[in-house]
Amino acid sequence: MIKAAIVGGSGYIGGELIRLLSMHPEVEITTITSRKFAGKKVHKVHPNLRGLNLRFTDKYEFDADVIFLAVPHGTSMRIIGEFLGSAKIIDLSADFRVSKDLYEKYYGSHEKPELIDKFVYGLPELHRKEIKRAELVANPGCNATAVILALYPFRDVTSEAIVDLKVSSSAGGRRENVASIHPERSHVVRVYKPFHHRHEAEVLQETGVKAMFTVHSVDIVRGLLATTYFKFEGSEKDLLKRLLMYRGEPFIRLVTDKGGLQRYPDPKYVIGSNFVDIGFSYDSENSRAIVFSALDNLIKGGAGQAVQNMNIMFGFDETLGLNYYPLYPG
């Protein structure tokens, strides 16, 4: 049994961390911090967790084997010094995911550049061995996870890709924002980031492929779909053969149906789970490939992947506390 602390537990991903860890057979949650809600019971912020006897605190004094930093981008680098050396750390912000040069290009100046190289990029499908030995893990971004897994099998045959992303309202976080209130968000298919999305940096770092994201807000609460286009010389069988590198991965499901409504990945069928569904289509006449990847941005794109990383870091079964099917209908 290990002890876990969550720094920044009031957001959507923080709430999912609490939910997943509270059901994990090898974890005791010792501390959940929130400045705004200090002293309040967890269910006052996350009503789905009614019955869980935990309260928020604003104190950083706690006993833990693993610390999850579920704070806004830019905050982790400011506070991480308080925790270094006291426990293993899994950071869910973007602060330590990419190199100093990429960070400065996509985000701006970094307050703790000397720590970046000490973090392992926490995508288990690519870095399982490194994660197992790591003390510090940077949890990947949700969009980046979907696109990296789509492109990685093709990194040696393509250098550029175009990515169409459909993302849910929860991806914007829990802070009040006029763009996310119901009258403004309902029924939209809204382009909000046509160029230079920050998660492109993670894709470039992990695959070597220059991916151009165009992100659309759509009228769903959770989940995302990445549609990734690139040139590919070969056949449909060659495409599938490359994707079969994921055979045996516990949280990747290849969608290869030839007909029906579910012949391509759809975020509707991964909601509430740590699965990524990956499918494809191929235009042999024009040598164009499309790889589709769907995931729940709060689980495999956030809290679930963090728990998966924790399992690996502590030598637990990788699927422990995560081995359940998606909600349906959702």
Swiss-Prot record:
- Enzyme Commission identifier(s): 1.2.1.103, 1.2.1.106
Matches recorded under Pfam families:
Semialdhyde_dh, Semialdhyde_dhC_1
Catalytic residues identified in the record: C142
Which GO biological process entries does UniProt record here? arginine biosynthetic process via ornithine; L-arginine biosynthetic process; lysine biosynthetic process via aminoadipic acid
Keywords of the record, alphabetical order, are: Amino-acid biosynthesis, Arginine biosynthesis, Cytoplasm, Lysine biosynthesis, NADP, Oxidoreductase
Name its pathway.
Amino-acid biosynthesis; L-lysine biosynthesis via AAA pathway; L-lysine from L-alpha-aminoadipate (Thermus route): step 3/5; Amino-acid biosynthesis; L-arginine biosynthesis
Q: Which residues bind NADP(+)?
A: S10, G11, Y12, I13, S34, R35, K36, N297
- Protein's name in the database: Putative [LysW]-L-2-aminoadipate/[LysW]-L-glutamate phosphate reductase
Organism of derivation = Pyrococcus abyssi (strain GE5 / Orsay)
The gene designation is lysY
